[in-house]
Structure formats: C-alpha cells, structure tokens
C-alpha cells in the first residue's frame, strides 16, 4: 500500500484536472455570450450565463455528502468517480445541444455540478485517508490538480472555440474528459479501515468534547463552535476567489482592454496562482499550523481585494493580474488547507461527510462571488 497510494494519488490528480476545467467557466461564458444570438435566438446577459456556474458550484455539497454513502453502496470509491465522470461528461455534451438558458442551467449547472462534486469529494477524501502523515501537502496536491484544469485547458478551449465554436468545444471536451476519467478511475482504490503508513505513529489527539477517539460525526461537529467559525471563513475565501477565478476573462477584458485570446491566457495565469497556492499553503500549514496559515491568507485577500477594487479604472492588465493572482493563490490555499483542517479538527473517520458539510461554505461563496 505504501507504493499503491502514490498510484491512487496520480489517478486522482488526473481526474481532478479534468473536472477542474469547470472553473475555466469564463472562457465558455465568453463563447456563449458572443454566439448568444445564434444559440439562444436572442442576446443574453453575462449575468444570466454566470448563473450556470453559480448553480454548478452551489450544488456541490449535496453530491459530496451523498457520495460517501454511495461509496459504500457501490463498493468503493472507483464506482463513485466513474459516476461523477459520466455525469460531468454528459453535462458538457448535453450543453452542446442547448437552445435556452434553462437547459444551460440543467446541463452545465446540475449535471456538470453533480459530476464534479461526486468525483472531487471522493478523490480528495480518499487520498487524505491514504496519507495521514502528509495531510496538508497531499490535500494541497489533490486540490491543486483541480485548479490545474483551469491552467492547462483555457488556451485549448479558446482555440477550439475559435475554430469550431463553443458548442463544438463542449462536445469535444465532454468526450475527452469522459474517457480520461473512466480510465484514471480504474486505478483508484481505498485503504483498509484504520490503515497507517509503515513507521508512522499518529500524534495524540486532544479530546475533551466527548467525541470518540476516532473523531466526531457530523452531529457532534455541528455542536462544535469551531465548525461555524471555519465555515464562515471558508465562505469568505470562496467568495473572493470564485469572483476572480470564474470571471477572470471578462474582468481582464474590461479592466485591461484585451481581446478574448489574451484574456484566456490571463485566466490560465490566474489558474496557475490558484493551483500553486493549494500546494504552497498545504505545505505551509503542515509546517506552521492550519490556523496561522489561514490567518496570513486572510490578510493577503483583504489587502488584494481592496487594491483590486481601487485599480479597476487603471486600464492596467498587469495590476489586475497581480492582485487577482494573490486572491486566487489564497483562495486556492484555503481549498488545499480545509480538507486537512477538517480532518484535524473533527477526525479522519467521518471526514468525507464532515468536509462535504463544510463545503457548504464554498457553495455559499459560489452564490455570492460570481
């Protein structure tokens, strides 16, 4: 298992790169907006299109929580990841045939949203179970892969949109990602109950709240004041981060005065900061502690958010990128730290369900931010 866990991590990384393209929504949105009259039969507003991403993000806690129950019924994480991959792929392919905003909300918002969350929740929770000795770093790497999708694919997406249109792009990527996820999931297994890496002894757990030594289930977690402080902080990080990540393309065009191709590159640069932040802050949190790491990130987000709002009329793409990258880096950092933070605070045994509930904070950010 010591070697096998690395294969599981690599497979999970591939899955998360694929589903992470959902966060390059701003590239899709630009294509849909430009082709709106043909696709929808009328002009559409960017805010109407952005609602699809809001729904996609907002439904995430439901399948993340349900996925842990499905994992038992479907006999392992592999089948749940397959289910997520099929839903995500089907959502993209079905989006290529839509002719109304309502259908966009169903295909991209619900189908893709459920598919992404099923796969994401299982891959993150499962890899953290394989690496209790490196929770912060591994959670950071796993979630970084999710962010990497928004680095690798926007230029490819923009090229496909330029050559064949946005609907063609949905269709091609839907097929590609479906195949990649199904193959990668073949290598995903789960560790035995209570498994520990060879030679590693878990640190003593402070337990003064009446929870079992294995941790707190969701009911005990909801009775803990820390949960509410943690979820509020998660919402704040997600609000600022999703505002920049999901709307990077139109923001770059509006503030920097650049065309869609350059804006797609800006989205990739922001995605790089998002991805790098997940690994960086996951590693930092292992060294200095989860709460100090989050405190530093909070200060950076506050300063960068204020600066970004102050320079919106500057016309400088460089200034926009600097502050957008800082926000994205810390948003990504929170995504990398929170799976480990939740496991540290409430135990690893129930972390799948507990983190799914904690992810409601992210969903709220998805409603507020974009």
Question: Where are the regions that the model predicts?
Answer:
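Hydrophobic core of transmembrane alpha-helices in multi-pass small-molecule transporters
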Residues: 17, 91, 102-118, 235, ...
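Cytoplasmic membrane-interface "Motif A"-like loop-to-helix N-cap segments
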Residues: 72-84, 287-298
